[in-house]
């Protein structure tokens, strides 16, 4: 028990001064460049759609002027339009919170760079757009044929703003950083504008998204600490989908209450979870935990997670947010894919002397399919086809030029092929391509006041084929199989790294 407590005891050497560099170092941007976190080398800090219209010199001067004028005492009843120093306080808050978010990201980015560079002899792919969605690729490529049950988990969202502040308490050395964080949360925003749970994943206010995402990711990082801790305690516990993205987090604060829930000897509890076939992945506000264990073992996992989150975060976590499903009898809509385990029957003829036997074998196979019905429903809602899948023209695009119309249809087609390139069966994608191609032809024919046959005969069918099949240079990943044949290479799954920016395909229900 003492060994476990020493393991969970926070390491004070990991703490950092976050606010002091922002206030007292005038050239804080030089600090970022010295650590290799500039725009060309950054892993976590770069966002392609991020509006980077502020400098840390301005942020530092804003803090100095606000302290001199004592503007932190402005009441929350004041309107955001009440200006001081020539600007409104919403602008001040946004600029300072963005600068604060950048500062606190620096040590975490350095830690990730260090963990990635620790793989000696391994070629680790480094991308500045690396996100949690990319951890689902190896998860879907894992062999699920031996697994029996899955836990569908909705990660509990913080019911109080103070929980978000406390998630950083082990990494912060200067208390002024926490005070500034509380000021941002309580002075300018409320919980409803920070995190909403109307969708499977959480949505954030459009203001200071970088700041909010950092807080939420820190909170989720703390929620997942239980899996990393158990993985380190058991050499058999696998976390194949995370690799260097996760590392140990310290949650000693309320672990004693958790121990009292189970038993006096915590090792007995740990023994229950030494599962050699455990697969875990998270994307947005959902988590999936797949195991070869029995229903009793999965029920113990459910009980453990509920009590851990309740004790550690002091929140009421309902057991209804965790569902136990049998993998062979349950299909799930995961990230826009329809994932299921199907049985492939095979018959083997065995002959012994004069007697022959027919042996029926059922082999489990994990499929990631394209959900054709929801996808056609989305196309019908966007007026590309009917609800039955019959292509129709797009009248609102008739005023565009021919090249713009073809480019828009081609972009949608390429995005769909990129997103669902990891599907085990791509026959559905060619049906979607047929719908978009014919819808494009009918839109062009409508614009030129002719029939589809006449338009294609005059322009040539190669025109649409060239635009709809043109590929862009996009980074992708493929996972090698044990057996590689020509047919296997043709049917291999390709995972593109840009799928997180393809519309909202990952969010539709």
UniProtKB/Swiss-Prot annotation:
Transmembrane segments: none annotated. InterPro entries: Domain_X, Maturase_MatK, Maturase_MatK_N. GO terms for cellular component: chloroplast. Pfam families: Intron_maturas2, MatK_N. Keywords: Chloroplast, mRNA processing, Plastid, RNA-binding, tRNA processing. One of its GO terms (molecular function) is RNA binding. GO terms for biological process: mRNA processing; RNA splicing; tRNA processing. The keyword Heme does not apply. It is found in: Plastid, Chloroplast. It comes from the Eukaryota. Belongs to the intron maturase 2 family. MatK subfamily. Usually encoded in the trnK tRNA gene intron. Probably assists in splicing its own and other chloroplast group II introns. HAMAP family: MatK (MF_01390). This is Maturase K.
């Amino acid at each position: 028990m003492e060994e476990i407590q020493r393991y969970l005891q926070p390491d004070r050497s990991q703490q950092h001064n976050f606010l002091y560099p922002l206030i007292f170092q005038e050239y804080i941007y030089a600090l970022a460049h010295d650590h290799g976190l500039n725009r060309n080398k950054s892993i976590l800090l770069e966002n392609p759609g991020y509006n980077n219209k502020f400098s840390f010199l301005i942020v530092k001067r804003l803090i100095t002027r606000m302290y001199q004028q004592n503007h932190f005492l402005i009441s929350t009843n004041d309107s955001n339009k009440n200006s001081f120093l020539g600007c409104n306080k919403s602008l001040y808050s946004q600029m300072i919170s963005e600068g604060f978010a950048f500062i606190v990201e620096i040590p975490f980015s350095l830690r990730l760079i260090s963990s990635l560079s620790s793989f000696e002899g391994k070629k680790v792919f480094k991308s500045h757009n690396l996100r949690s969605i990319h951890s689902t690729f190896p998860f879907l490529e894992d062999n699920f044929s031996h697994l029996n049950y899955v836990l569908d988990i909705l990660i509990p969202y913080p019911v109080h703003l103070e929980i978000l502040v406390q998630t950083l308490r082990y990494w912060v050395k200067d208390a002024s950083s926490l005070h500034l964080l509380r000021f941002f949360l309580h002075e300018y925003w409320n919980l409803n504008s920070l995190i909403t749970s109307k969708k499977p994943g959480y949505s954030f206010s459009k203001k200071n998204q970088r700041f909010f995402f950092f807080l939420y990711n820190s909170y989720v990082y703390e929620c997942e600490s239980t899996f990393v801790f158990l993985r380190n305690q058991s050499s058999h516990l696998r976390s194949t989908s995370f690799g260097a993205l996760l590392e140990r987090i310290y949650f000693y604060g309320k672990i004693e209450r958790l121990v009292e829930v189970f038993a006096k000897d915590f090792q007995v509890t740990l023994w229950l979870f030494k599962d050699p076939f455990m697969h875990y992945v998270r994307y947005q506000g959902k988590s999936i935990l797949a195991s070869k264990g029995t229903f009793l073992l999965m029920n113990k996992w459910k009980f453990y997670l509920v009590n851990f989150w309740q004790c550690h975060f002091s929140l009421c976590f309902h057991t209804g947010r965790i569902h136990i499903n049998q993998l062979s009898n349950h299909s799930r809509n995961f990230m826009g894919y329809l994932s299921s385990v199907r049985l492939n029957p095979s018959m083997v003829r065995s002959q012994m002397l004069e007697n022959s036997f027919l042996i029926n074998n059922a082999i489990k196979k994990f499929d990631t399919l394209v959900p054709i019905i929801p996808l056609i429903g989305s196309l019908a809602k966007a007026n590309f086809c009917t609800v039955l899948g019959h292509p129709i023209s797009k009248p609102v695009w008739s005023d565009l030029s021919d090249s713009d119309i073809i480019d828009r249809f081609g972009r949608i087609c390429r995005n769909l092929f990129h997103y669902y390139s990891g599907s085990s069966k791509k026959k559905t994608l060619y049906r979607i391509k047929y719908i978009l191609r014919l819808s494009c032809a009918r839109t062009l024919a409508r614009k030129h006041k002719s029939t589809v046959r006449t338009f294609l005969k005059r322009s040539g069918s190669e025109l649409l084929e060239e635009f709809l099949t043109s590929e862009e240079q996009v980074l992708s990943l493929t996972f090698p199989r044990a057996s590689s044949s020509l047919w296997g290479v043709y049917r291999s799954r390709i995972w593109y790294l840009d799928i997180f920016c393809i519309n909202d395909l990952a969010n539709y229900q």
